[in-house]
Amino acid sequence: MNKQQFIDRAEENLLHVYNRFPVVFDHGKGVHLYDTDQVEYLDFASGIGVMAFGYGNEEYENALISQLKEITHTSNLFYHSPMIEAAAKLTKAAGLSKVFFTNSGAEAIEGAIKTAKKYAYLRDGFAGHEIIAMNHSFHGRTVGSLSVTGTDHYREPFLPLMDGVKFATFNDFSSILANATDKTCAIIMEVVQGEGGIYPADADYLKQVREFCDRKDILLIFDEIQCGMGRCGSLYAFQQYGVMPDILTTAKALGGGVPVGAFLLNDKVAKQSLVPGDHGTTYGGNPLCTAAVSQVLDMFENMKLVDHVNEIAPYFIAVLDELVEKYDFVESRRGLGLMQGLVLNIPVGDVVKCALLEHNLVVLSAGGNVLRMLPPLVITKEDVDEFKMKITAVFDSFK
């Protein structure tokens, strides 16, 4: 089939909930993607932050092939070694006590919400507790995760959602205080807001929130589904701030391309929250996906990938800062590590489309006016130079 035939067949059978670009990707190698016409694209989106190693990494692929030949599913009624190994590695890496594996980031958020509510229920002896979330946040599209997503246009068609959620202003501690009540059981936030526009948390703000949560026995939930897994210059972004969460959600690059997420708990919460019968999943923690998690964590360590991010990020950031200086419609840059955004005063959707269809560059948007870059963590200076050439050509067409 040619490209248009693929697209026509997709529209016949797939529910149209994404406005997809007219490109049909066929395979990838390194930091490049190739469509069905064998056109090469530079990928600075990495499947929305998923493909940390890029495409076609043989070590990763061989680990999955090996597990496929052994066993792919048992259900959570039984133990299996890939899940046990992945749990040990992930809890150690994150500095937390227990983990529950899910199939996605949104499922991890659902588990975090349930954990916080159950913790407060056991402590107080009654339900009806509240959660403080952040304006302009994004935590997923399931009912629970959408309930704590602070972006109206995602929420409005599905109201009423879960009640007891209040929204505070990110990086404004006074807004936390204004929304907190005796019923508050948790505060949830992204350490770097992604979909909302690439806003890193302020260090003083996180410390104030942590101290407040400690005083009030409120659980602090960090959503690092997008900003975690090395992207910001540490395995998890919170590790740069010296502020520990009570609950952590993670996904995307955690599995290197297979659908897996997780929520992790500290010891206090793990001992006073979910018990058998409270939470479960048929596929979560299956042997194939947890073998992927284990392999990903091993490769992060063996490749010293976080060190590489810290080495390449300044070079990439310097290129982005040059673009801010060069083009009047590029107002500013913000971000952390290899999670970067350029604030534009021209329609960002037009820029993303032009980059893809005219210059074979895959980038993303965020927050309405931000050009978002989430390149594979393995990018080199040569890849950044290629990005610079392509994005300069894109921006020149908007002068």
Predicted regions: what is each one?
Residues 1-399:
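Conserved N-terminal phosphate-binding loop of PLP-dependent enzymes in the Aspartate aminotransferase
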